[in-house]
Amino acid sequence: MEFEDDAFVLAARAHGETGAIVELLTSAHGRYAAHVAGGASRKVRPFLQPGARVIARYRARVSDQLGSAAIEPVGEGPAALFDDPLALSGLSAAAAVAAGALPEREPHPGAFLAFEALTGALTHPDVWPAVFVRFEAGLLQDLGFGLDLSKCAATGITDDLVWVSPRTGRAVSRQAGEPYKDRLLALPPFLLSAQGGLRAGDVAAGLALTGHFLEAFIFGPLNRPLPPARLWLLDRLSEAGRL
């Protein structure tokens, strides 16, 4: 089995004296693990940081066994964010969420595009936290657990949608949800429209929303918690006053 594909590095760990096992999110083939010869070397290791954009040439003798990959870096990757530790935390958290949520060797082009959009936004400090929420919503969508924010689940109206049912992932209008608001999840307006700026608390509400469904539908059934990198990101965003 052989293919060449655009990819993002999700994780890498040393293997043997000089090699590395690398988790890749590829554009057309999904999440793949591969052995990279020399991946632990000073020359190659900088290209294998979480979030790095690469071209991967994958080869395996048997399709269901671990293959090898030759990696060619594309652009600066995480190095462009070295002066922004918070953005680097966002990139690491996104890589950890994707690595934990996506099944191996199953195409998920929507997840790749959502990750790509986030990496493009990370140099814009006022924008990327909201794009991170959209990335997680896109990941849920691509895995079959998309939020239905098109209309109120109770009445069918499309205006004044301010909550989401934690059970179904469907939007609820202010009037219909008022009696049950303590049991509903807040719906930040930026998930409904790209128009307008962020309000205080919108990013926190968005992360609580996507985090709930990632935990309920993806990580929980696998008996795994949300990745520590995501929890650290919330702490750092809070410390920076960015929630």
Swiss-Prot record:
NCBIfam families, alphabetized: reco (TIGR00613)
Listed name of the protein: DNA repair protein RecO
One biological process term in Gene Ontology: DNA recombination
UniProt-listed Pfam families: RecO_C, RecO_N
Function as written in the Swiss-Prot or TrEMBL entry: Involved in DNA repair and RecF pathway recombination.
UniProt keyword annotation of Ribonucleoprotein present: no
GO CC annotations, alphabetized: bacterial nucleoid
Keywords carried by this UniProt record: DNA damage, DNA recombination, DNA repair
Coiled-coil ranges from the UniProt annotation: none
Family listed: Belongs to the RecO family.
Organism phylogeny: Bacteria, Pseudomonadati, Pseudomonadota, Alphaproteobacteria, Caulobacterales
InterPro entries: ARFGAP/RecO, DNA_rep/recomb_RecO_N, NA-bd_OB-fold, RecO, RecO_C
Keyword hit for DNA damage: yes
